[in-house]
Every structure is written in C-alpha cells, then in structure tokens.
C-alpha cells in the first residue's frame, strides 16, 4: 500500500520511502484490579464482546478505538494514521461541514475560513495552466461557491513565522554559552520531520528545534484569535480549514498543543491536500480555469490583497535565506545582497557560509529528504555538526514536492516539479518586515514583538515520546 505521507513519517532506519505498517501496535493498558479473578470473554453474533465474571454477570466491553492523538503519542511506530485521517481530516469532512452550515439555524452556523498555501496554489496553477494570481482568485471564487465565507493566503501568516525564526536565532546565537540556547537551530515548519524527531531522537534533537510555529499554525492563531475577535465570534464559532501540499500537515493540526481547552476547538479544524481540492473540483463538476475570478480576501484592512505575494529563498518558505540575511545584519553588521548556495553531496543538501577576512561567521545548511536528515542527526549525536542553522524538510526537493501535490500522469515528475517551481517563482516577493499589516498586527493584536502574548500565539513546544514499557501489544 503506497502512503501519501512524507518519507520521514514512513521511515524505519532502513529506507526513505517504505510502505507503512498495516498493524497498529499501540500497547493496551491492562486494568488489573485486586481480586478480580479469572473472567471469560463472550462474543455475540453481532460481533460485540462481553466479559463474563465468575458469578455469571456480563459486562459489555468497549470497542478499541485509536484516535489521531493516540497515534501521535504512540511510540510503536511513526505512521499508521491514514484510517483516522480519512474521517477526521478529509475533503469529505469539509463538505459535510459546509452542507450542515447551509441547513443550520442562524445561531448554529459557523463562519468558514479556508487558508491556502502558496505551494498548493502553484501545483493547481500548473494543472489548470493558469498564472498564480488567476489561480488565487479562481480558488477564492470556488470555495465561496461551495459555502466558504473567507479565503486567505498562508503567505501572510508565513511573515510572522519568518520574523519569529529570525529573532529566535539571533537570541540563541548570542546566548549559545547557555545549554538551553542550543545550536544549531533546526527549523520546525515540517511536521513529518518533527514527528520523527519527537519519536526517535527526542532528547538529542528537541533542544535544537525552533519553537516558531509553522505558517499553517500561525494562521490558526490569526483566524481563531484575531479574526474571530474582529467578527465578534468565539473561536468555536469559526471553522478553519487549510489547503496544504503535505499530508503530514493533518498530523500537525491535530497536535494537542494546538487545541483550546477553553473553547474546545482546534486552531485548524481540517487540513485538505492539493489533490483533495482537485477531487472537490471534480465532484462539483467545476474546472478552475472556467470560473470567474473573485477578489482576494485579507485579514486586516491595511493588508488588502490585489495579488498574492511570496518570499525569497525557495519553495519551502525561505527560512534559511531570511534568517541568514537577518543574522548577518543584526549580529555582524553585514548586508547580504545575494545568498550563494553551495551544493554538497546532492541537490537536497546545500550550505551557505558568511565569511569575513577568512573567518567563518555563519554556517547554514538546507537538508531535504530523510537520508540527508539521518546524516545530519548522526553528526549532531557525535558532536560534529558544523552548522549554526539548518532548514530541514522531510520531502526530497521540499514542500513543492509534497506528497499531497498533484501528479501528472503524462509528465515525468522532474519536469512537473520544474513547472511548479517556475510558477511558484512568478509571484512577487517581499520581506516579511515590510509586508503590509504585519507591524500593525504585532502592536494591535500581539502587544508588541517579544511579548508574552506573541510567545504564546506564535510559538509552540515539542515533546519526546517515551518508549512504551508494556510488553503487551495488540494487533488491531
């Protein structure tokens, strides 16, 4: 069975792209009560299970259920979440919510917001032979046609993610003598990589991982906190779906860290992939190219959008490039006009160096794909990692090549990726600190950069998953 998840989420220590385990081995906690004695299990014709005690009493046993949270917290494997995601995170779930909204009483309806990633937009632009701006406007028209109220671009939330990553690196670099300010800093925007780090090398890797939220989860904060307030709604009255190039983003949205106990709602309620958007279009009998374009939505008036924008530094968000430029200026007073990448063992492993008078001041790298990640981890464990900062992505070639992107049966994968990269690169870029609305939101929404509120809404934490101590494993 082929899996749509990233290599890092499917891995064992042997290969980059292996099929996931067909069996969940989540250990069962056995309830051993004193004096309970021996009991029998009776199976009814309908398949239900009853515990028969020694005195003849019968108690119906609960069905074993594996939730997505169970999967994330399970140390038995680093995969096997597909069956849960089919129901909890799918375009059918989005369709169900949109359908229910149309028939619900006004006070029971939810405000539906859909946030689209630039990578997904580029993939759809190639499929429908559109430019990025027309793709964005026609996607807005389509989602509103099926019941969404607002459609946003996660390039806006990526501004916050990049700025927080810049500040975090400078702080860690200046305080690197402190064991808690560990270098190198490893990016955290890729959930496949984060899942692997937490489950496989927690104590080694987690101190190095950036706490800055990914663009998806920053958008979750923006929509459920800032935008909900602007609409005079509580977060649970807003349904937020995202369109992503990656199946692993479904796991990220389901993390307990991004769930509000107060309002009983997630920052991102549903994640659908680029391919699932294409399925929605097919099911609706709509061709994106034939739709009339609609005006683009913006989160605040000062950031009104006439066209989509993006960032320099490649199709995975540009973390390396933005942090490198900022650090060079902030730490050493050097203005970097052009970032020069030097390929190493392969095209998915590159490095960038800042030198002055022969001295290396900054040493950054980009490591994509599990094999490069594995080599990076081994260097870290041996204390031989020369880098200050590493942009880590589980998918070879990064997010534009994510497992949720559209495939072209009549085009080689390499050629398709080149076309997606070309259209992604056509979008006008801007520095995150210069993006309209960003500084206003830092003051108006977050009470200033570096505030407690900014830390709470723009950062997160990661958790090493302990190996289960129970020897009893159940095949489901």
Curated annotation (Swiss-Prot):
[4Fe-4S] cluster 1 binds at residues 24, 71, 74, 77. The keyword Ligase does not apply. One of its GO terms (biological process) is iron-sulfur cluster assembly. Gene3D superfamilies: 3.40.50.1780, Fe-only Hydrogenase (Larger Subunit), Chain L, domain 3. GO terms for cellular component: cytosolic [4Fe-4S] assembly targeting complex. It comes from the Eukaryota. This is Cytosolic iron-sulfur assembly component 3. The gene is CIAO3.
